[in-house]
């Protein structure tokens, strides 16, 4: 890459970043937080944060990258995607009407709410315990991270249930919403994330997500400022780098440490070059249509229920890894959101996918606002826990693609909904047995619903 080519890419990167950052800043000033703000920051991180890191790798360490014209296509496709997404998100198909009283779809009381978070926490802890009994501390047993996906490790499906510890702790926080509950959320979820990091052998997702939710709650409540958020972001990047070194068993120093920091940070937070690799091999891609979305559900179906289930799931990430990169190391390489759309339907699917994502984020913001307006604090805690708990799925959306997001959000919805139903069933059984008594302390009517 010549200096002139880099200068052209830099101009496009600056304009695109300024465009997205400006819209995000105006939205932040208007509402302080919603899921449009979160997705916009996540989109910036995924598709634009890595450009400076790539530039240093190219000019400082002479690392090979995709041709400049392909990198330009990656930057422009990301900017155009966001433009279509933003227009979709802001477009209102019908006039806003004054809210009229409607019969609620469901209600929650104190006992049901506490039962819900206990059930969610129980799902996570029992899954961790069973996985640990089968495998022990994988971080100290395995020699490479790819071994996590080998036959040496049993009960891999249980990892999908670990995450429900976070929405459980979110319910606890939203019932109190003070600084002590906020700090308790951080300590409990990060401690659980470190435990799963050691047990699973290097999975950092629970730690990253817990820390991100903690920061956004702090921003919403005004407990942390923007400069504190930036400082926490730097601390988070350094922390994730250290955990990555431990995960891959790397011992580096000097220039090698700087080089390792650059490429690990880029791959962890901003795998934008993966999109460039897909575009570089565009002529070799056999478009998969919507099949990757259907295939991604296969991993949630146990073999005892479907004995003939394919052992290899060809979703967009695996197609990119195996068919495009010809990489069979055992790790799936993230194609990114836009990359998954390219795998499914080429360039035509990029604006269509942007419209779909705009509607998805709009729905989450509608649910979040519903929780903000809800007078029943127990129901509000459940709604907010569901919304913030889905942040993990939005990270999957940006990094892994639309197919992975759809399967995971459906799985999250099913488990969360089942926990609610079980909590209501248990409350009904306890109430029928005469074990539920009304509280003697008088509370505001808006905070009391049903028998407490």
Swiss-Prot record:
Keywords: Cell inner membrane, Cell membrane, Membrane, Transmembrane, Transmembrane helix. Pathway: Bacterial outer membrane biogenesis; enterobacterial common antigen biosynthesis. One of its GO terms (biological process) is enterobacterial common antigen biosynthetic process. It is a multi-pass membrane protein. It is found in: Cell inner membrane. Pfam families: WzyE. One of its GO terms (cellular component) is plasma membrane. The keyword Transcription regulation does not apply. The chain crosses the membrane at residues 6-26, 37-57, 63-83, 118-138, 155-175, 181-201, 207-227, 228-248, 341-361, 378-398, 410-430. InterPro entries: WzyE. It comes from the Bacteria. Probably involved in the polymerization of enterobacterial common antigen (ECA) trisaccharide repeat units. Probably part of a complex composed of WzxE, WzyE and WzzE. Belongs to the WzyE family. This is Probable ECA polymerase. The lineage of its organism: Bacteria, Pseudomonadati, Pseudomonadota, Gammaproteobacteria, Enterobacterales. The gene is wzyE.
């Amino acid at each position: 890459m010549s200096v002139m080519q880099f200068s052209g890419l830099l101009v496009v990167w600056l304009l695109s970043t300024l465009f997205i950052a400006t819209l995000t800043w105006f939205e932040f000033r208007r509402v302080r937080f919603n899921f449009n703000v979160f997705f916009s920051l996540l989109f910036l991180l995924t598709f634009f944060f890595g450009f400076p890191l790539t530039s240093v790798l190219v000019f400082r360490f002479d690392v090979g990258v995709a041709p400049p014209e392909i990198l330009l296509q990656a930057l422009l496709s990301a900017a155009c995607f966001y433009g279509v997404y933003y227009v979709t998100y802001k477009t209102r198909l019908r006039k806003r009407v004054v809210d009229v009283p409607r019969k609620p779809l469901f209600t929650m009381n104190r006992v049901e709410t506490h039962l819900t978070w206990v059930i969610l926490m129980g799902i996570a802890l029992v899954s961790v315990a069973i996985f640990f009994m089968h495998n022990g501390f994988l971080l100290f047993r395995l020699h490479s991270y790819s071994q996590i996906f080998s036959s040496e490790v049993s009960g891999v499906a249980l990892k999908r249930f670990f995450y429900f510890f976070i929405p459980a702790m979110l319910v606890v926080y939203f019932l109190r919403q003070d600084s002590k509950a906020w700090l308790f959320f951080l300590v409990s979820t990060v401690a659980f994330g470190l435990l799963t990091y050691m047990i699973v052998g290097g999975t950092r997702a629970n730690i990253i997500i817990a820390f991100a939710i903690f920061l956004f709650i702090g921003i919403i409540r005004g407990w942390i400022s923007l400069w504190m958020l930036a400082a926490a972001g730097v601390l988070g990047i350094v922390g994730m780098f250290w955990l990555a070194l431990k995960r891959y068993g790397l011992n580096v120093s000097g220039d090698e440490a700087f080089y390792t920091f650059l490429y690990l940070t880029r791959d962890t937070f901003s795998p934008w070059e993966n999109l460039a690799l897909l575009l570089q091999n565009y002529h070799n891609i056999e478009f998969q249509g919507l099949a990757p979305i259907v295939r991604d559900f296969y991993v949630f179906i146990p073999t005892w229920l479907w004995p003939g289930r394919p052992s290899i799931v060809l979703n967009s990430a695996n197609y990119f890894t195996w068919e495009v990169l010809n990489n069979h190391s055992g790790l799936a390489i993230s194609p990114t959101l836009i990359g998954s759309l390219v795998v499914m339907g080429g360039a035509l699917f990029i604006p269509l996918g942007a419209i779909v994502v705009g509607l998805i984020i709009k729905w989450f913001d509608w649910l979040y606002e519903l929780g903000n307006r809800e007078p029943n604090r127990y129901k509000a805690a459940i709604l907010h826990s569901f919304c913030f708990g889905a942040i993990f799925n939005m990270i999957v959306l940006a990094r892994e693609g639309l197919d992975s997001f759809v399967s995971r959000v459906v799985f999250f919805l099913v488990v969360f909904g089942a926990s609610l139903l079980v909590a209501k069933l248990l409350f009904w059984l306890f109430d029928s047995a005469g074990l539920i008594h009304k509280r003697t302390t008088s509370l505001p009517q808006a905070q009391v619903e049903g028998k407490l």
